[in-house]
Design a protein with these regions (language model features):
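Conserved beta-strand hairpin/beta-sheet module of binuclear metal-dependent hydrolase folds
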Residues: 1-42, 141-157
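Cap/insert and terminal regions of metallo-dependent hydrolase folds
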Residues: 160-251
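Acidic/polar short surface loop at catalytic or gating sites that assists cofactor/ion binding
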Residues: 75, 79-111
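Divalent metal-coordination and catalytic microenvironments
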Residues: 3, 21, 29, 53, ...
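Active-site metal-binding motif and surrounding structural segment of the metallo-beta-lactamase
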Residues: 35-80, 173
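Active-site neighborhood of phospho(di)ester-bond hydrolases with catalytic His/Asp-centered motifs
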Residues: 29-32, 47-57, 79-81, 154-159, ...
Length: 255
């Protein structure tokens, strides 16, 4: 599997984008930095979008993706929970603000809702996909992808303390998880997020449960704290003896 990081930050600027990952150029995981990071041709080549939860920084570019596809009369399946679809239609895709692409055009809606929930398994874009529940401030799904050659990617989306028990239901080769704030802001836990210190605790628990540490790619870092978080994550890697790194915007990684 090839993983391309379209957005790896909890903040948007010229140099940073909200969360979005692209797997093998065809499957988008979350849509925070989707259209902002893809050419029109790359957007038209997407086979599906999977949305893990309703927060704005994970759904923002559904509004622009839908419009670009509408112009070309394309349809795409959007895999998300019923709760996420309802939130989108009440807010971002409310006709008072934009276009409800789940309903328009009436004869062939741009977005085809494919409902998912924790425990769901499906075959998607040549991968076996399994959804797990992860602890966050709103209902959130983690995504395990298994390729035909047996390689596994686990994308946890946003999650906070006690996440390791969910992670341990998988045996990933690459774990993509979050660190939002530095250790100086322990209140991150109150909002369902991790600091480097909290990440270290979850990884130690994962190793206790599973007997190994996967390679770890850290996303969702607030860009104002990037240097501080990077230094603290490097210290975690040294302490645990693991391969743990901050994801680069636009970075491409082999799983």
């Amino acid at each position: 599997m090839k993983l391309r990081v379209l957005g790896a930050r909890q903040g948007e600027s010229r140099d940073s984008h909200f969360g979005s990952l692209l797997v093998d150029d065809s499957l988008a995981l979350d849509a925070g930095g989707l259209t902002a990071s893809l050419t029109l041709e790359e957007q038209l080549a997407l086979e599906a979008v999977l949305v893990t939860h309703r927060h704005y920084d994970h759904v923002k570019d559904l509004a622009t993706l839908g419009f670009n596809l509408l112009v070309r009369r394309r349809q795409i399946p959007v895999f998300c929970s019923d709760e996420v679809r309802e939130a989108l239609e009440a807010t971002l895709l409310n006709p008072q603000i934009w276009i409800d692409f789940f309903a328009e055009p009436a004869d062939a809606p741009t977005f085809r809702h494919a409902p998912i929930s924790a425990g769901s398994t499906l075959d998607l874009a040549g991968k076996r996909v399994r959804l797990i529940s992860v602890p966050h401030s709103v209902p959130t799904l983690g995504v395990e992808l298994a390729s035909p050659d047996g390689r596994r990617l686990l994308y946890t989306s946003d999650n906070g303390p006690s996440a390791a028990a969910s992670w341990a239901t998988s045996r990933p080769d690459l774990l993509v998880t979050e660190v939002t704030y530095p250790n100086a802001q322990p209140s991150a836990a109150d909002h369902g997020h991790l600091t480097p210190r909290l990440l270290a605790a979850e990884l130690a628990e994962f190793r206790r449960l599973r007997g190994y540490l996967p390679r770890v790619l850290v996303v969702h870092v607030n860009p104002f704290n990037l240097d501080e978080v990077a230094a603290e994550v490097a210290a975690v890697a040294a302490d645990l003896g693991g391969q743990i790194e901050i994801a680069e915007e636009g970075g491409v990684y082999d799983v």
